[in-house]
Amino acid sequence: MADDSALHKKYPFLNLLHTPPHRPPPLCPQAPRKTQCKRRLGNEHEESNSPLATPCVWPTLDPWTVETTTSSLTITTSTKDGTTVTVQLRL
């Protein structure tokens, strides 16, 4: 059998056989648990007779339009100087 150092010079990957195994990386900290929230459906609010906690009051004389689709809500109004303001919420 040939000398080990000669083998290691000829085949350097043999050195890998004698290296200690790598330690696994430390685990990432877990994310905090998400609190459970009850989703209310739109018709649940209509069935309850209790008023809203904060009444919705819009201090303007100009009317606004509300358009809805299955995935968005668009509210449009005009300011006193004629600027059109559009707010779109995409779900």
Swiss-Prot record:
Presence of keyword Transmembrane helix: no
Free-text description of this protein's post-translational modifications in UniProt: Phosphorylated by host ERK. The phosphorylation triggers a structural change that enhances keratin binding and protein stability.
Single Gene Ontology BP annotation: symbiont-mediated arrest of host cell cycle during G2/M transition
Region (Disordered): 15-54
Keyword annotations from UniProtKB, A to Z: Early protein, Host cytoplasm, Host G2/M cell cycle arrest by virus, Host nucleus, Host-virus interaction, Modulation of host cell cycle by virus, Phosphoprotein
Localisation: Host cytoplasm; Host nucleus
A Pfam match: Pap_E4
Annotated Gene Ontology cellular component terms: host cell cytoplasm; host cell nucleus
Domain of life the protein comes from: Viruses
InterPro entries the record matches: Papilloma_E4 (IPR003861)
Assembly behavior: Assembles into oligomeric complexes. Interacts with host CDK1. Interacts with host SRPK1; this interaction may favor expression of late viral transcripts. Interacts with host cytokeratin components KRT8 and KRT18.
Known role: Associates with keratin intermediate filaments in certain epithelial cells in culture.
Other remarks in the entry: The major E4 form is first synthesized as an E1^E4 fusion protein from spliced E1^E4 transcripts, such that the first few amino acids of the E4 protein are derived from the N terminus of E1.
Similarity comment: family membership: Belongs to the papillomaviridae E4 protein family.
Protein name as it appears in the record: Protein E4
Organism: Human papillomavirus type 6b
Gene label: E4
